[in-house]
Design a protein with these regions (language model features):
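Glycine-rich phosphate-binding loops of nucleotide-dependent enzymes
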Residues: 1-245
Length: 245
């Protein structure tokens, strides 16, 4: 589905990604893990046309390099960004409708109404708060809203940037259960997560990004048991803890 080959990305003269090559197959959950500043968000933003880059990015066999962000969305890719970036003064429902802005232009109002109901079925709390200002939501509710807004574009590939950031453990479980459910319903997912243990626990495969380069990749279960990953991202006692259970 998604092929990234020899990708470089820049902020001014600063090189943020250095020859990244990776892929996502249809129906997978793939996670990118790494420390702050490793380039994870830059990679997602490069896919969305938000960062100057060179190399090759193809989606379903067609190049999406240098497409405008709205054209990337039209191809079937949408993102729930880091920090959620909701429109705080607007209502929950208005935020969700903004996720379907391209479809409004195509006069798909009836389909949009159906999909809005699906989002409320996925996140009942959003239905309860639909007429309230989005800025009044809790952190977990705002994350639900960010994911719901991205889904309103009807993506085939959903990009999630730090979906567990700042959330209580119970809410993290709810969000990750939702990610698994979305995959079952046919949405392919590429997820950036600093919480490596949580991300690898639900992913099929993973990539470890360090200072703009992929340094390790493989099945999620293998990465969970890799000594380098264990010490750098899971804590030095994680292996002993799991082996002692």
């Amino acid at each position: 589905m998604l092929q990234i080959k020899n990708l470089y990305a820049y902020y001014g003269k600063i090189e943020a990604l250095s020859g990244v090559t990776c892929h996502v197959r249809t129906g997978e959950i793939v996670t990118l893990i790494g420390a702050n500043g490793a380039g994870k968000t830059t990679l997602l933003n490069s896919l969305c046309g938000l960062v100057r880059s060179r190399g090759n990015i193809s989606f379903d066999g067609a190049s999406i390099m240098h497409l405008a962000p709205e054209a990337v969305v039209a191809c079937g890719i949408s993102q729930a960004p880091e920090g959620r970036q909701i429109f705080a003064p607007l209502t929950v429902e208005e935020n969700l409708e903004l996720g379907a802005y391209l479809r409004f232009r195509q006069r798909q109002q009836q389909e949009i109404a159906v999909d809005l109901k699906k989002i409320y079925d996925l996140f009942p709390r959003l239905w309860e708060r639909r007429l309230q200002a989005a800025g009044a939501l809790s952190g977990g509710e705002q994350q639900m809203l960010a994911i719901g807004r991205a889904l309103m574009a009807k993506p085939r590939l959903l990009l999630l940037d730090e979906p567990s950031l700042g959330l209580a453990p119970l809410m993290v479980d709810i969000i990750m259960d939702t990610v698994v459910r979305l995959r079952r319903e046919g949405v392919t997912i590429l997820m950036v997560e600093q919480n490596a243990r949580t991300a690898l626990g639900i992913a099929d495969r993973g990539y470890v990004l360090e200072t703009g380069r992929i340094i390790l990749s493989g099945p999620a279960a293998d990465l969970l048991n890799d000594r380098q990953v264990t010490r750098a991202y899971l804590g030095k006692d994680y292996r002993e803890f799991t082996e002692g259970r």
